[in-house]
Amino acid sequence: MIDNGGRFFAMKHGRKIHRLSRPADQRRALLRGLTTQLLKHGRIKTTRAKASAMRKYVDKMITLAKEGSLHKRRQALGFIYEKQIVHALFAEVPERYGDRNGGYTRIIRTLPRRGDNAPMAYIELV
């Protein structure tokens, strides 16, 4: 056993989470904001880590909109910051993504950011 000051840390096999160097509440707020902006504009530029972390939540919101029940709409309203985006999402998504089972976003790598050389990417709705 490894001596690490009396604390034992078990390995987290298969439980990958993108921490993004933030506490849980700030990370959730960041991902909610990025998801809202992507659904509003259709395409945003962000770091690759943030893009891959938010992809899960965007796909979840689109899946909720495809199901379209009142319960799913209220779940989406609890996550997306702007009410108008939720209404537009639930009106537009069933005919746009009706035959697609997942994979609603595309990540396009681009040049690193000039100031700190962070890897950047565009994330867009397919």
From Swiss-Prot:
It comes from the Eukaryota. It is found in: Plastid, Chloroplast. Its main location: plastid. Residues 1-10 form a transit peptide. The keyword Chloroplast applies. One of its GO terms (molecular function) is structural constituent of ribosome. One of its GO terms (biological process) is translation. One of its GO terms (cellular component) is chloroplast. Keywords: Chloroplast, Plastid, Ribonucleoprotein, Ribosomal protein, RNA-binding, rRNA-binding, Transit peptide. InterPro entries: Ribosomal_bL17 (IPR000456), Ribosomal_bL17_sf (IPR036373). Component of the chloroplast ribosome (chloro-ribosome), a dedicated translation machinery responsible for the synthesis of chloroplast genome-encoded proteins, including proteins of the transcription and translation machinery and components of the photosynthetic apparatus. Belongs to the bacterial ribosomal protein bL17 family. Component of the chloroplast large ribosomal subunit (LSU). Mature 70S chloroplast ribosomes of higher plants consist of a small (30S) and a large (50S) subunit. The 30S small subunit contains 1 molecule of ribosomal RNA (16S rRNA) and 24 different proteins. The 50S large subunit contains 3 rRNA molecules (23S, 5S and 4.5S rRNA) and 33 different proteins. HAMAP family: Ribosomal_bL17. This is Large ribosomal subunit protein bL17c. It comes from Spinacia oleracea (Spinach).
